[in-house]
Amino acid sequence: MAWGTVEAEPEVDNWLGALSDREFGHVAFYIDLLEAEGAKLRGKLTRPLQGDVYELRFHMGTEDHRISYWIASGRRIILLTHFRKTRMNERREVRRAIRAYEKCVAERHNAEDD
């Protein structure tokens, strides 16, 4: 039984739609794990970014990837942004994820509204 439900903001939805079937299956494994475990998912797969925003961490090929998310009311896991992890872009991407979260909260928006 799932801990919650996963909803994707347009950025993540578009990125997922552009993946090959093989890549999508790989990423779906981690998203499904997040859906099954929710806030209980810990260890190397998740990390808090700031406040209520976390990142789902996974490898695809030789690259590290991240999907930022937050847990909204009703155990809804909202996927906010996607990025490839590099040392050079981490601070910028964390700020971008925080802005996406703040926009969601300010607009009382959730992915179901799209």
Can you name each region flagged by the protein language model?
Residues 1-64, 73-77, 83-114:
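Basic, Lys/Arg-enriched alpha-helical interface segments
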